[in-house]
Amino acid sequence: MTEQQSPPEQMVTGEGAGERGGNYKITIYELENFQGRRCELSEELPNVVDKALEKVGSIQVESGPWLGFERQAFAGEQFVLEKGDYPRWDSWSNSHNSDSLMSLRPLQIDSPDHKIHLFENAGYTGRKMEIVDDDVPSLWAHGFQDRVASVRALNGTWVGYEYPGYRGRQHVFEKGEYRHWNEWDANQPLMQSVRRVRDQQWHQRGSFENS
């Protein structure tokens, strides 16, 4: 059954610049495949309903990256939105737990360099893995366990995943310290793959080491 769509109705908000001077632009659509009412954003939106959208059915990121959230006020499951088209909810959700995306904000990239420390236990104790300017699709394959209970993001912005191959729930780590897994809203200290969130102009190959 084909649903008849009317031409998109457009709204624009924001000034087009992030806090660090970078440009951010994203278009959210109420229906799948870039149909229905739409809204162009260049700044955070705590509730898509404020822009007269009942939901988000598809997304086009012109410049970013952005971070989407399952619930209003930047709560719930997180979804990293990098430059490109997302025609359906399952194109931005790696866990496929929920088709809801109700708030979003620009994701700041503080540096072209990336360094992160993963710790086995809370409080930065136990085994440690350092990753520098690299993506790791499987912590197990590189000699580390799947238990990550605290994190130090020293440079750059990272996203950790519940399962290998960048699958499952996503958890974003902006530069800072995360003493306990509840500080990144995880239900348990489980992380099996990690990658950088990068500006498209940066393509560096890096390294990792365990201790």
Swiss-Prot record:
Coiled-coil residues: none
PROSITE patterns registered for this protein in UniProt: CRYSTALLIN_BETA_GAMMA
Keyword terms of this UniProt record: Eye lens protein, Repeat
Domain Beta/gamma crystallin 'Greek key': from-to ranges: 24-63, 64-108, 114-155, 156-198
Region (Connecting peptide) residue spans: 109-113
Region called N-terminal arm, residue ranges: 1-23
InterPro entries registered for this protein in UniProt: Beta/Gamma-Crystallin, Beta/gamma_crystallin, G_crystallin-like
Gene Ontology molecular function: structural constituent of eye lens
GO BP terms: lens development in camera-type eye; visual perception
Positions of the UniProt region annotated as C-terminal arm: 200-211
Region (Disordered), start-end ranges: 1-21
Description of how the protein assembles with itself and partners: Homo/heterodimer, or complexes of higher-order. The structure of beta-crystallin oligomers seems to be stabilized through interactions between the N-terminal arms.
Record function comment: Crystallins are the dominant structural components of the vertebrate eye lens.
Written domain comment of the UniProt record: Has a two-domain beta-structure, folded into four very similar Greek key motifs.
Family designation: Belongs to the beta/gamma-crystallin family.
Protein name (database record): Beta-crystallin B3
